[in-house]
């Protein structure tokens, strides 16, 4: 007795697909294209649907030819062959290499010559031009040539000449910044009805208090370097490994964004010895790190 072969469910599905796709398609009539009197065309096509039935599709279309007058130089440039990385790209602008901007048409006014002449003869306008000729945009935070609102350090540094909580250098242990609350308490002692803590009252011996570690716990600004133009992907350990080649590093502070966790572009490196800091400043200023050139200088003491 012959044994019957049992097919798997996947084999049965493949068998059904093959029987469906092998429907007879050789007996279909060729497509027809008929021109009508009103200028339209009637296109008749035949095909086999999913049920294996012969279907006739009739379409009526109208061909419209639009002519556009362009600059012959522009038309010639469109026929140029692409080269380099875009040699195999199709015709037209590629989105990864070309940015298509808005075509702005310049339309001068009718009295533009008279307006230009009046503007040239205006003494106030000329005085304003002479006044602003040598002036440049200067940031109030980092003294860079950009607007203060666009400064990359506006969230972490205070404007020059102002004391603020965002000043990174002031937050690393400077004595002038710590003396602020004591001065405020002394000034507020003269106001009637205002409360002044006992430690800040006039004549209090421990007005400012002592820091943990005494004088050895304070930061030496003379041995602190300010590193700018730091990559967003930089890490504190990488900076420590680079700067520890010149001496013992006591602290590394890399400013990072609170939301993204990426570096903001600057860092502070503190050395135990100023001679090591001078050596590191001379060697690392202009050093290439993560495709960027580092700018290393001594940190300025907070005012």
Swiss-Prot record:
Keywords: Cytoplasm, Initiation factor, Protein biosynthesis, RNA-binding. It comes from the Eukaryota. One of its GO terms (molecular function) is translation initiation factor activity. GO terms for cellular component: eukaryotic 43S preinitiation complex; eukaryotic 48S preinitiation complex; eukaryotic translation initiation factor 3 complex, eIF3e; eukaryotic translation initiation factor 3 complex, eIF3m. CDD domains: eIF3G, RRM_eIF3G_like. Pfam families: eIF3g, RRM_1. The keyword Protein biosynthesis applies. It is found in: Cytoplasm. Residues 223-301 form the RRM domain. Residues 1-38 are annotated as: Disordered. GO terms for biological process: formation of cytoplasmic translation initiation complex. Belongs to the eIF-3 subunit G family. PANTHER family: EUKARYOTIC TRANSLATION INITIATION FACTOR 3 SUBUNIT G. RNA-binding component of the eukaryotic translation initiation factor 3 (eIF-3) complex, which is involved in protein synthesis of a specialized repertoire of mRNAs and, together with other initiation factors, stimulates binding of mRNA and methionyl-tRNAi to the 40S ribosome. The eIF-3 complex specifically targets and initiates translation of a subset of mRNAs involved in cell proliferation. This subunit can bind 18S rRNA. Component of the eukaryotic translation initiation factor 3 (eIF-3) complex. This is Eukaryotic translation initiation factor 3 subunit G. It comes from Chaetomium globosum (strain ATCC 6205 / CBS 148.51 / DSM 1962 / NBRC 6347 / NRRL 1970) (Soil fungus).
